[in-house]
């Protein structure tokens, strides 16, 4: 699995240390192991997880601005844990409302010895602890839902980072709260079938 990850990282031009690569492989192994009992992801094959979960998360890394991030609806820690491994200098809060996901994330943090991840069991609208440089999510079906539920989370210069498949410009027109489009970035995820985009917004 390490050899495949090496190849994917090379294709995506993402430089990581040997320790970071090993942490990512160990995370996939943990996810695969826990998935059998907890049903954390519909992706069952570890090699597929490397592409659909690890690489799909890591390609966002170079576009992040700031130090404090929250991953809303993180599920089993995606994209938060891969991004935290790749960015040990940044802090990540991983938020989810389902206990089994947060239990898995706590275990992964312990096993991988991550010091820059804080798991939080909460609904997003009830989380008022702090504001962030970036609000990340792969979980929302529409931009309007993401902005609506997470509007209180970015700080004054913070951004929303929405990981999407295809980007439909009309989605932006459906956002009910005041928002500004900063960028739409086409992401290159090696071996992934289908388009991926990062939509960057600010208030």
Curated annotation (Swiss-Prot):
Subcellular location, principal: cytoplasm
User: Which regions span the lipid bilayer?
Assistant: none
A GO molecular function annotation here is: rRNA (guanine-N7-)-methyltransferase activity
Q: Where is the signal peptide?
A: none
Keywords from the named record: Cytoplasm, Methyltransferase, rRNA processing, S-adenosyl-L-methionine, Transferase
Question: Binding of S-adenosyl-L-methionine: at which residues?
Answer: 73, 78, 124-125, 138
InterPro entries under this entry?
Answer: rRNA_ssu_MeTfrase_G, SAM-dependent_MTases_sf
Q: What is its EC number?
A: 2.1.1.170
Q: Which Gene3D superfamilies match?
A: Vaccinia Virus protein VP39
Compartments in which it is found: Cytoplasm
Name the reaction it catalyses: guanosine(527) in 16S rRNA + S-adenosyl-L-methionine = N(7)-methylguanosine(527) in 16S rRNA + S-adenosyl-L-homocysteine
Q: Which SUPFAM superfamilies match?
A: S-adenosyl-L-methionine-dependent methyltransferases (SSF53335)
Q: Which GO terms describe its cellular component?
A: cytosol
What's the stated role of this polypeptide? Answer: Specifically methylates the N7 position of guanine in position 527 of 16S rRNA.
Q: Which PANTHER family match?
A: S-ADENOSYL-L-METHIONINE-DEPENDENT METHYLTRANSFERASES SUPERFAMILY PROTEIN (PTHR31760:SF0)
Q: Which NCBIfam families match?
A: rsmG_gidB (TIGR00138)
Question: What family, per the record?
Answer: Belongs to the methyltransferase superfamily. RNA methyltransferase RsmG family.
Official protein name in the record: Ribosomal RNA small subunit methyltransferase G
